[in-house]
Regions:
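Compositionally biased intrinsically disordered regions enriched in Thr/Gly
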Residues: 1-233
Length: 233
């Protein structure tokens, strides 16, 4: 039963340590979606547990314990839509672990995922309008993070080689909360380590205000977007 779904999963063994946590609010407003996320996490934990055990048994001298951490948070909600952000950190041998983010938009009524594309009259045009904003935002972040004398213009050109309107549309896209309650302030696009820059630079994300793309919103969704995006400090 959905009411019995745990809000936290944990595995502790000598060869594998895993955990998964879920925003409590999800179980209140979207228990069916929460149950789906829990089951997905359970399957991933069990699969990595099995992989770790198999590797340990096959090559115990070179084996290092595996780890997997999964976290889901509710980022924004408006009307029938909610936006979730996932974070996964994993280690399965090698010089370092890997991590990445996941963004999902769900319909509360259907409990199914909804793409940002489905909210837009002309997705390609909306992304083309948003791309310059994303490139400038990432370039500024890279300038602050990496520095080294490189200019924002240099980082912008490098980012443009890795990011296009097409890759954005097929990437990890979510919605963000707004300064105006009960609406979305924009969308966020996530980039995993290696997608932009070196692994050492880490992940990046850029938030595009709804004012940039609202002319491309379908009438059924336009009222759900207003204000300015609420961003992290």
């Amino acid at each position: 039963a959905i009411a019995d779904v745990p809000q936290h999963l944990e595995v502790t063994k000598d060869y594998f340590v895993g955990s998964a946590s879920f925003d409590e609010a999800l179980f209140e407003i979207a228990p069916g979606i929460a149950a789906t996320l829990v089951e997905e996490a359970r399957v991933r934990l069990e699969a990595m547990d099995a992989d770790a055990l198999a590797y340990k048994q096959a090559d115990p001298d070179y084996f290092n314990p595996y780890s997997l951490s999964i976290q889901w948070t509710l980022e924004a909600a408006a009307g029938d839509l909610i936006s979730l952000e996932g974070f996964t950190a994993a280690y399965s041998g090698g010089a370092h672990g890997n991590y990445g983010t996941d963004a999902r938009i769900y319909s509360l009524k259907s409990a199914k995922q909804v793409s940002l594309r489905a909210l837009l009259t002309d997705p390609a045009a909306a992304m083309a309008e948003s791309l310059p904003f994303v490139l400038s935002d990432i370039a500024q972040q890279r300038t602050e993070k990496v520095g080294g004398g490189a200019s924002a213009e240099t980082f912008r050109a490098e980012t443009a080689d890795a990011v296009s309107a097409d890759t954005m549309l097929s990437g990890e896209l979510g919605l963000v909360a707004s300064t105006q309650a009960g609406t979305f302030g924009g969308f966020v696009v996530h980039f995993a380590p290696y997608e932009i820059g070196s692994y050492a630079e880490g992940a990046y994300k850029a938030v595009v205000p709804q004012s940039v793309f609202r002319d491309f919103l379908k009438p059924d969704y336009a009222a759900l977007f207003a204000g300015e995006p609420v961003t992290e400090d």
